[in-house]
Amino acid sequence: LVVRQQSDAQGQLGLGSGWLTQHAALNSQIALRIRTNESFHLINDNRPVICIGNGTGLAGLMSLLHARTRQDYTQNWLIFGERQREHDFFYQSTIEAWQTTGMLQRLDLAFSRDQEEKVYVHHKLREQAQQLKAWVDHGAVIYVCGSINGMASDVDQALIDILSEAAVDQLRQEGRYRRDVY
């Protein structure tokens, strides 16, 4: 579980992140319910997957990647963005181990605050446009998980610019473009 405390412009904490960071005792049990996103389930075959996300969205992508590694499916590409590598590279040892063992064929990281000019996941998509096209041509399924504000729309636009609007619409219709954004 990855939790980052969120607040609105007035400083009001987010309902879930505020409760978890301010009221839930560390290592205590809490009652919760899991709400399934029916459109974000993992495919049941060995087609390549491209996982794109930022922040706490990595948790959703990690569940997909864990399932694929258990089945020895290695055509996995993770494009992940956060603020600072030193503080925000969640699951770093697991991700690096997957890369070393070949379970993660590609890894592109975008740490927006580690350099003067901010770099986000949509920039990484654009940098890797030819690879993206090749993976999609080989049947890749694209999963996007994370911020609805900013990241999700920027990724949408990058995909449209790289692949075309018609191609992205076709991916959606075929169930090859799946999102869990919040």
Model-derived features: positions:
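Reductase modules of NAD(P)H-dependent flavoproteins
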Residues: 1-40, 69, 73-182
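Active-site beta-strand/loop microenvironment that shapes enzyme catalytic pockets
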Residues: 45-68
